[in-house]
UniProtKB/Swiss-Prot annotation:
<dbReference type="InterPro" id="IPR027417">
    <property type="entry name" value="P-loop_NTPase"/>
</dbReference>
<dbReference type="InterPro" id="IPR003439">
    <property type="entry name" value="ABC_transporter-like_ATP-bd"/>
</dbReference>
<dbReference type="GO" id="GO:0005524">
    <property type="term" value="F:ATP binding"/>
</dbReference>
<feature type="binding site">
    <location>
        <begin position="37"/>
        <end position="44"/>
    </location>
    <ligand>
        <name>ATP</name>
    </ligand>
</feature>
<dbReference type="GO" id="GO:0016887">
    <property type="term" value="F:ATP hydrolysis activity"/>
</dbReference>
<dbReference type="InterPro" id="IPR017871">
    <property type="entry name" value="ABC_transporter-like_CS"/>
</dbReference>
<keyword id="KW-0067">ATP-binding</keyword>
<keyword id="KW-1278">Translocase</keyword>
<keyword id="KW-0406">Ion transport</keyword>
<comment type="function">
    <text>Part of the ABC transporter complex ZnuABC involved in zinc import. Responsible for energy coupling to the transport system.</text>
</comment>
<protein>
    <recommendedName>
        <fullName>Zinc import ATP-binding protein ZnuC</fullName>
        <ecNumber>7.2.2.20</ecNumber>
    </recommendedName>
</protein>
<keyword id="KW-0862">Zinc</keyword>
<keyword id="KW-1003">Cell membrane</keyword>
<keyword id="KW-0997">Cell inner membrane</keyword>
<keyword id="KW-0864">Zinc transport</keyword>
<dbReference type="GO" id="GO:0010043">
    <property type="term" value="P:response to zinc ion"/>
</dbReference>
<keyword id="KW-0813">Transport</keyword>
Length: 257
């Protein structure tokens, strides 16, 4: 598996406060990684470090040479008095011809939106257009900040299916930022639980019973999300085989003891 972006002991400090503390992680080609954590956990800062918008105070960010990173923001503020069609909005991304713009919209199931007014789009349609705009550059890494915010439950499931399909078509790495795992559970390969440092990371079914996850999100949510809920000292993969505990930074005192 090819590593496209690697963070090595990244710390970001604002004044005396460590927003990110010794964060190490990798984004691999063909993998969907979901970043979760409470508000104020440092998720937005981590995204800025990955996309190159912020330099770490200490530590290193290693990006594969020549990779392209696409970014879909959590929300987009548009001037409601400014007429703007979807196609004109897509043109703002750079010098991509009409065929490229139509191809990107087609990939997200948004061909019919080509001439629509941006202000008339539903939440789900807006997310598809933002995705299409990010796809114009054919990214190796696609970063999605709360990609289903403002979308109803049925629309959320459709978007997660679309994101999974885009990963398969483009063979890219996808990083999704989310508050929880309710619908991303079956659509992600790896979960990183962040609270300034990485509390735990691994496959979704190993995360939901992890002490650090329970401490942040509560036992009830953990039990609701767990694929398998056993009172054992081990966990299970999807085939039912025992697996070891979630990888974890023991220096923060969150081990399984």
């Amino acid at each position: 598996m090819t590593t496209l972006v690697e963070l090595q002991s990244v710390t970001v400090t604002f004044g005396d406060r460590h927003v990110l503390d010794q964060v190490s992680m990798k984004l691999e080609r063909g993998q969907i990684t979901t970043l979760i954590g409470p508000n104020g956990a440092g998720k937005s800062t981590l995204v800025k470090v990955i996309t190159g918008l912020r330099k770490p105070s200490t530590g290193h960010v290693v990006r594969q040479k020549g990779i392209r990173i696409g970014y879909v923001p959590q929300k987009l503020q548009l001037n409601s008095t400014l007429p703007l069609t979807v196609d004109r909005f897509m043109r703002l991304a750079g010098r991509y011809d009409e065929n490229a713009r139509k191809e990107a919209l087609s990939l997200v199931g948004g061909t019919h939106l080509h001439h629509s007014d941006m202000h008339s789009l539903s939440g789900g349609e807006m997310q598809r257009v933002l995705l299409a705009r990010a796809l114009l550059q054919k990214p190796d890494v696609l970063v999605l900040d709360e990609p289903v915010q403002g979308v109803d439950v049925n629309g959320q499931l459709e978007l997660y299916n679309l994101i999974q399909s885009l990963r398969d078509i483009l063979n890219c790495s996808i990083l999704m930022v989310s508050h929880d795992l309710h619908l991303v559970m079956a659509k992600t390969d790896n979960v990183i639980c962040l609270h300034h440092h990485i509390c735990c990371s691994g496959e979704p079914d190993t995360i939901t019973n992890h002490p650090s996850y329970v401490a942040l999100f509560g036992q009830q949510q953990s039990e609701q999300l767990a694929l398998y809920h056993h009172h054992h000292n081990h966990e299970h993969d999807l085939a039912g085989s025992p697996v070891g505990p979630c990888q974890h930074n023991k220096q923060h005192g969150h081990d399984n003891a």
